[in-house]
Amino acid sequence: MGFRLSKIYTRTGDKGETGLGDGRRVPKDHPRIEAIGEVDTLNSQLGVLLAGLAAAGLNELVAVLAPCQHRLFDLGGELAMPSYQALNAAEVTRLETVIDCWNEELGPLENFILPGGSALVAQAHVCRSLARSAERRCQHLNALEPLAGVGLAYINRLSDLLFVAARLIGRRQGVAEVLWEAAARP
């Protein structure tokens, strides 16, 4: 099956350090831990989005986004164990294919849009912005300790997918996009 965690607490992190999958101990504010934490936060919020999509019967979106939770867990594994590679280019291509398909249905943007219109649209934008934050944390780590594999490309493409997903959710719900209105000029 998979990995089993028989003990949840170890007390080894009580003094501000944590262990990586390769056995190293690092401070809990180490850039690698920051990156892992941002990916974990994104994954948690993606779970909230998926629960809402399932409840709303938006199974097409669930079918595309549910595997992303697993791939984010894979990315976390890659970050925790630098020699471990789980993601591959086919995962990035899968996201690009869906983006192109959904974007063709939606058509071009005429204006900037704001997160909102419905709770699900807003939650998709929360996930998108968290994907960008996770990407920044991963890029910061990459500048210090170069990352192997396609994780950086995956997280970048995932944020694009989540933007397009937000638009598609609105379309499926019959909710108009909230267009940005520039401040009046004095």
Could you describe each region identified by the protein language model?
Residues 1-186:
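Phosphate/pyrophosphate-binding loop motifs in nucleotide- or prenyl diphosphate-using proteins
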